[in-house]
Amino acid sequence: MSRFCALNIGNTHTQIAMGILKNSAVKWEKSETFATSAIPFTELPIDIFTVYSSVVPQITAIMKAKFPQAVPCTAANVKSVDFSSAPPTLGMDRIANCAALVQKNPGGIVIDAGTCITLEVVANRKFIGGAILPGTGILARAMHDYTGALPLVDCGITPDLQQFKTETLTAEAMKIGIQSAAVAGTLQLLSNFIKKLPPASPVFVCGGNRQSLLNQNCTVPLLDGGNDFTMQGLAALAAMYMK
């Protein structure tokens, strides 16, 4: 058995977990979520093999300075997916999602519904691209910040879009507009991208707002990737280095 630490550092939240690898299988021993602005760096183990994904440049710099032995989830470090066509700026979270996907199937799509909504498309273990959309929180903030009177609304989880009706209250009208833009935009891209893959290619949905997509009556079956999909990609990275 081999123990390791994994950090999934997002824009708003960071998941830190201790894992145990045994016969290529991972068991999560402990998992905690923190605000990214309050990561307990002084409490991170320095004597345990560590892997991480970070989408925050300032935090990435801290990790490199304080934990130079930790392995970042970069395209160069992940060998299970061909990233030869990807730009050097490809986010670590997207790379980790691809690594998690190919543990389940050589190809498919991962939709990560977080602060931003990302789609990753993998065909025969090769990353072929994807898309990035603003999440509901970003859209809500933009409408509030760039107008003089619109309030800042909390959109929460999006129900089935087919249930929406006309709204008279400004906040409710904004809410259904924002939810529709984020969800319908994502599903439209999915319908385009899935055509690039063989029939029955899996589509996994992960991220804190994934239920908003899982609630939809989608023509493409959506699989719940759970709370630790990105962490599974980090576990795959750890397994490769700890062989």
Model-derived regions: residue spans:
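Short glycine-rich phosphate-binding loop at a beta-alpha junction
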Residues: 46-56, 71-72, 199-208
